Regions:
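Alpha-helix capping/helix-boundary segments
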Residues: 99-100
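Conserved phosphotransfer cores of two-component systems
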Residues: 108
Length: 453
């Protein structure tokens, strides 16, 4: 039966290796200077070659992202800089700019090109156009519903389609955001996004003065005291002034009716419950977003979505426990995005801009070292004797209560203090620990206060 590709992020070689170990079929990584991951990118030429070689040795695929919106200066060096990357043998380039696509088609006609989500493909005519231009896959816009995706699949059956199913969402349309550039001169469309939409803002009512300028009415009031109305009350025609917490006196005008602490702060996408339907549609690739994400995130999302894809391909019903498993990842609240219609407050988090989980925290990475029945764990976050833990491996997961651990000298320990420590704990000797990770289950705590009561 048809089985879609599971496509994971690879901001680092380590992330890539964990994604592959836990079931990803392919990964994507940005090319230096020409992707939107300039600030969060380990992949220089040496690592790109390593990544591509390792992927192919495993029978997996590696896509290189070249989706920048270039100014003239970057056109001068583009083909020169891209040539060695193409020679490395990536399975495709992910691109958005028509001019760069034209140059690649002229100079490297054999190179597969996937249309980036930044190109904003929202209808079947656009998909058909890019098919006629020689592209082999289109990453559809996040703003599409399930019904619209199905219609595109029906109208253009020969074109490969890719859909985002998990990860952070931009408040800007298809990610084409100007906020970071406006506030601190870091252009998101040049790969230097500072996630300004996640910062804390204050809001106050504004008004139009006699010459048409928007000015504030009174002193700023912390927006935490303003009740959100979007999606649950009547729309407002008021004007609001927005002040970023670290830039007092600098105001931006907002004509929308978003009222909340982090008024531009989207919830995170989670569409695992729709994997079965997307599989039946014939969507070729299900993609996980991963800017600034850890190897633990890459491993956990790959493991969970691998299970969902395999179940869908085998004709098994969706397992709701997978939704609960994803709650163990720190997130800003989950949404189905635009796949189904919701009220606006289902898309946006009004309360906080950070990622948090009240289910689990990643606390350790198994190093692979063994001493009889004991195995070494590189501690990442504090945990203690008596804690409920989950040992996660590519072969399966095991939950248990920690009853014993010791240091390298064989001395018993009650607490693994945190990052930088190595402890030894009992693990069955027949359990393979390659890429094994350790999580602590919460009971009334969160990742923001993991040891509170």
């Amino acid at each position: 039966m048809f089985k879609p590709e599971l496509l994971s992020p690879a901001g680092t070689l380590k992330n890539m290796r964990y994604a592959f170990a836990y079931g990803a079929d392919a990964v994507y990584a940005g090319q230096p200077r020409y992707s939107l991951r300039v600030r969060n990118n380990e992949f220089n030429h040496e690592n790109l070659q390593l990544g591509i070689n390792e992927a192919h040795a495993l029978g997996k695929k590696f896509y290189v992202v070249v989706n920048i919106a270039p100014h003239n200066a970057k056109l001068k060096t583009f083909i020169r800089d891209l040539k060695p990357v193409v020679e490395m043998g990536p399975d495709a380039l992910i691109m958005s700019d028509p001019g760069l696509i034209m140059l690649v088609r002229e100079h490297f006609p054999q190179m597969d090109i996937h249309l980036s989500v930044q190109a904003n493909a929202v209808n079947w005519a656009t998909v058909k156009f890019w098919q006629q231009m020689g592209l082999t896959r289109v990453i559809l816009s996040r703003e599409l519903s399930l019904e619209e995706i199905a219609e595109i699949r029906e109208q253009v059956p020969e074109m490969e389609l890719e859909i985002f199913v998990h990860g952070a969402l931009c408040m800007a349309y298809s990610g084409r955001c100007l906020l970071s550039g406006y506030i601190n001169k870091r252009d998101p469309n040049q790969g230097t996004c500072t996630n300004a939409c996640r910062w804390e803002y204050k809001v106050q009512e504004g008004k139009e003065d006699s010459i048409g300028n928007i000015v504030h009415i009174h002193e700023p009031i912390p927006v935490q005291t303003v009740e959100p109305t979007l999606g649950i009350g009547a729309p407002t025609d008021k004007v609001f002034m927005i002040e970023e917490a670290q830039r007092p006196g600098e105001y931006m005008t907002a004509f929308e009716d978003e009222h909340g602490t982090y008024i531009m702060n989207s919830k995170d996408l989670r569409a695992i419950q729709h994997v079965e339907r997307l599989t039946k549609m014939g969507v070729h690739s299900l993609k996980i977003e991963g800017r600034t994400k850890s190897f633990y995130y890459c491993a956990r999302t790959a493991q969970v979505y691998r299970r969902a894809i395999d179940d869908a391909a085998a004709g098994k019903p969706f397992d709701p426990s997978l939704l609960e498993t994803l709650e163990g990842l720190a997130h800003r609240g989950y949404t189905e995005g635009f796949l189904r219609r919701h009220t606006h407050d289902d898309y946006q988090n009004y309360d906080y801009g950070y990622s948090v989980s009240d289910r689990q925290q990643f606390v350790g990475e198994f190093t692979g070292e063994r001493n009889g029945a004991l195995a070494a764990v590189a501690v990442k976050n504090k945990f203690s004797l008596g804690d409920s833990l989950e040992l996660m491996t590519p072969q399966g997961n095991v939950s248990f209560t920690l009853e014993h651990m010791e240091n390298a000298k064989g001395e018993k320990m009650e607490v693994a203090p945190g990052d930088g420590y190595t402890i030894w704990m009992p693990v069955p000797e027949d359990l393979a620990l390659d890429f094994a990770l350790l999580m602590r289950n919460f009971s009334g705590q969160t990742t923001r206060n993991p040891h509170g009561k």
